[in-house]
A protein has these predicted regions:
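Non-heme di-metal
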Residues: 1-165
């Protein structure tokens, strides 16, 4: 395997390990093991360092405009083709949990696509986005500017499920 493919595989593995370890940390914390949770969070942070290093070596961290366009392209692919295909397969198999997870992600990726597109338009005018508080739904990932809604329009969770980034 060529070095480029090794870097891509390493980036994917480190990224997945980061997310998995953060989920493990949440579980350890919830079960009353704060030091084990801290260990998982530390390892997750280390995996992020590795993933970012691999991404930089691959030349994938570019200008802000190029990074926004890459995010737009990725989110577009996810909500236009990837998640619809995943939803269809999960429905065919009768996996209701996967259907809900995929539908939530599809809806949120479309929102991210719009947010990134708006940010790129503003950036292309030579400015940063206007200052805003950004909130994320802890259930579905819905991302909103300037305050959490009373009820998430995607998963219908209450306002209390949103956290500020």
């Amino acid at each position: 395997m060529a070095t480029k493919e090794n870097l891509q595989e390493a980036f994917a593995g480190e990224s997945q390990a980061n997310r998995k370890y953060l989920a493990f940390a949440d579980k350890a914390e919830a079960d009353g093991f704060p030091q084990i949770a801290r260990l998982f969070r530390a390892a997750a942070a280390a995996e992020t360092v590795h993933a970012h290093a691999h991404l930089r070596v691959m030349g994938e961290v570019k200008s802000v405009a190029e990074n926004l366009q890459a995010a737009i392209d990725g989110e577009g692919l996810e909500f236009k083709s990837m998640y619809p295909d995943f939803v269809a397969q999960a429905e065919k198999e009768g996996n209701k949990g996967a259907v809900m997870s995929f539908k939530n992600a599809l809806a949120v990726e479309q929102i991210h696509y719009g947010l990134y597109s708006d940010a790129l338009k503003v950036l292309n005018s030579g400015k940063d986005m206007p200052e805003a508080k950004i909130f994320v739904c802890s259930v579905c990932g819905n991302t909103v500017l300037n305050g959490a809604p009373d009820k998430c329009p995607i998963c219908h969770s209450p306002k209390e499920k949103f956290f500020e980034v």
